[in-house]
From Swiss-Prot:
The lineage of its organism: Bacteria, Pseudomonadati, Pseudomonadota, Gammaproteobacteria, Alteromonadales. GO terms for biological process: tRNA methylation. Keywords: Methyltransferase, S-adenosyl-L-methionine, Transferase, tRNA processing. It is an enzyme of class 2 (transferase). It comes from Shewanella amazonensis (strain ATCC BAA-1098 / SB2B). The gene is trmA. This is tRNA/tmRNA (uracil-C(5))-methyltransferase. Its EC number is 2.1.1.-, 2.1.1.35. Signal peptide: none annotated.
């Protein structure tokens, strides 16, 4: 965190600097004009985590300032959603006088939604007992008078859930409301407003598509579910078990009938597509029955490995969302040998930081 950088009056200037840097970094690919999708300048983060500082009878949140190299008391947090900012003092007011709940509490995580749900995770440097559970239930009841809240208690090899370890987000995407189960400790897009813009951009970029879609790294089905109407069938892969389970829930709740998700890594899927190895996890799915003209990838910061780049290169259309423009640039050195960039976008998921989310649509030359 850089506390001095979080000034809404400076937001446009910071965004312009990101746009200029991204445009210059990718100029040699001769992309079309950069499409820019800004964030709200405040209250855009749906999830946050704070350390908890004990000072006598007082108890407060703190974060580490990377520039000043010191902890900063954080009673309110500008980037956090308004719901998180309302919950922050309400929770502390309950915790301060309650020894069972505050004893050796060292961190609080918040996961909120635009739909009004919030999940609070309390992390401890001690084992949790029946007294903690009793007090936590009472805490949930009191907070529940003002919030739609669930609580999780975590300690080493312990996890108590009151009553759910997930929230259900509702996003209005291109005139349609999509519902997403988001599980604690699983990846979700932190900036819901920009996440909607990313989904709408991806929908627009693929609206003239034919055939089927393959997605690697699908998470909870965030993109697959939104993009499904643009394709005959969608096949998606994800390795993390909680994300796969959430994706299956999301498929059902959104009534998507043309999407299958398999629990495999991108590397394993590459082996399966080449026929090098048969995976029982594929079940009855016949890979050869898919006519995937388009592939969608949203890889981790490390980007695509060499074998996956070769796999991706075999598709006519490539939609690539990147949380690390440096590794996107590396991957494009190979992909640009066979494909050209026809859409180029910046999504400002993380205002007031150097992080930039980029999107490119490539078509075979």
């Amino acid at each position: 965190m850089n506390a001095q950088a979080m000034d809404p009056q400076q937001y446009e200037q910071q965004l312009e600097q990101k746009c200029q840097a991204l445009t210059e970094a990718f100029a040699h690919y001769n992309p079309p004009a950069l499409e820019v999708f800004p964030s709200a300048p405040a209250h855009y983060r749906m999830r946050c985590e704070f350390r908890v500082w004990h000072d006598g009878d007082d108890l407060y949140y703190c974060m580490f300032d990377n520039v000043a190299k010191e902890k900063v008391r954080t009673d309110q947090f500008l980037p956090a959603s308004e719901l998180i900012n309302r919950m922050m003092p309400a929770l502390l007011d309950e915790l301060r006088p309650n020894r069972a709940l505050r004893h050796k509490l060292f961190q609080v995580d918040f996961l909120s939604t635009l739909s009004g749900e919030i999940l609070v995770s309390l992390l401890y440097h001690r084992q949790l007992d029946d007294q903690w559970l009793t007090e936590a239930r009472a805490l949930k009841a009191r907070l529940g008078e003002h919030f739609k809240v669930d609580i999780i208690g975590r300690a080493r090899k312990q996890k108590f859930v009151l009553d759910r370890d997930f929230v259900v987000e509702s996003l209005d995407v291109d005139g349609k409301t999509l519902h997403y189960k988001q599980v604690e400790n699983s990846f979700t897009q932190p900036n819901a407003g920009v996440a909607v813009k990313m989904l709408e951009w991806a929908l627009d970029a693929t609206k003239q598509s034919s055939g089927d879609l393959l997605e690697l790294y699908c998470g909870n089905g965030n993109f697959s579910i939104a993009l499904a109407p643009n394709f005959g069938k969608v096949l998606a892969t994800e390795l993390a078990k909680p994300s796969v389970e959430a994706a299956q829930y999301n498929i059902q709740v959104n009534k998507v009938s043309n999407l299958d998700i398999v629990r495999m890594s991108a590397e394993e899927f590459t082996e399966a597509m080449k026929g090098e190895k048969r995976f029982n996890r594929l079940g009855d799915i016949d890979l050869q029955s898919y006519q995937c003209n388009t592939i969608f990838v949203d890889p981790p910061r490390a980007g695509l490995d060499d074998e996956t780049v070769k796999l991706v290169q075999g598709y006519e259309n490539i939609l690539y969302i990147s949380c690390n423009p440096d590794t996107l640039n590396d991957n494009l050195k190979v992909l640009s040998e066979t494909h050209e960039v026809v859409r180029f976008a910046l999504f400002d998921q993380f205002p007031y930081t150097h992080h930039t989310e980029a999107g490119v649509m490539l078509k075979r030359r």
